């Protein structure tokens, strides 16, 4: 699952404020919340948006950001419950004023006030990537959820830095719940250096979730895949160009092959687009196989452009499902 932190520097200009020169703060939630426009939503993404630093540029990141943009592009009314010290560029992107995505329906944002926005930076050397957490926004708790959002048809818990409290697992009793647990598999030291950790609330989350999606790169202990697969109702493990493996309870896992993009430019956000597309189609059809094919087709478009500029419409995805070529099929 490609991280949105890996976006190309051309995606967004350097219009954001620089990160704080302090150790990662825990973030304190305020008594009030700032939002654009509330009301009923069909797809609720819960998790930190982030400012990711790439080649001295500050860019929009976070699974919640990409998932929300995807759900909006697929025709849903979308809300985000997050915590951040909003910079204007982030708001412009999420509510649609950047004119880069259609439709123009604004994403409804509820923000828990905090002193800092979650920020990641990646450093690369001959040994690979080292990731640092430079700032962290406030934790997200059940008390932050407005009453009208508790009945959202789809709820996507998308932790980025251990910010989602486990009580949120039980705040949406009638919703289809998607969990992308990447941010529950990260820890960091006093210098902000990120390292893998075991998913602390895995049993509780797997018991509640309708769908769990992560990549083979996210899991610190690969042997846990089979264990999680036995406990989950539906679990999808993405494998980049190989597509994904789908685990249904009491069934053998099966593969949905990836679609070939017209060109390959940037994988940023492909995993997040896959997840939101899967949940959207699974909610519409109830068919885990059809949802996997739909999500693979949607994710293939993301590779063709920079970051969220490649997020497709439903019509484009359906056309690729009919006419697209698949890897390994």
Region locations from a protein language model:
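Conserved phosphate-binding/catalytic region of the ribokinase-like
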Residues: 2-8, 12-13, 17, 30-39, ...
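Short beta-strand scaffold segments in enzyme catalytic cores
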Residues: 69, 120-122, 244-247
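Charged helix-capping and loop-helix junction motifs
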Residues: 60-64, 193-200, 259-260
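Histidine-anchored nucleotide/phosphate-binding helix
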Residues: 62-73
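Active-site metal-binding loops of divalent metal-dependent hydrolases
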Residues: 47-49, 273
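Conserved N-terminal subdomain of the carbohydrate kinase-like
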Residues: 35-42, 51-57, 73-163, 168-178, ...
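Conserved beta-alpha-beta core of the PfkB/ribokinase-like small-molecule kinase fold
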Residues: 154-227, 232, 242-243
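Short hydrophobic/aromatic-enriched beta-strand-loop microsegments
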Residues: 108-109, 177-181, 235-237, 255-257
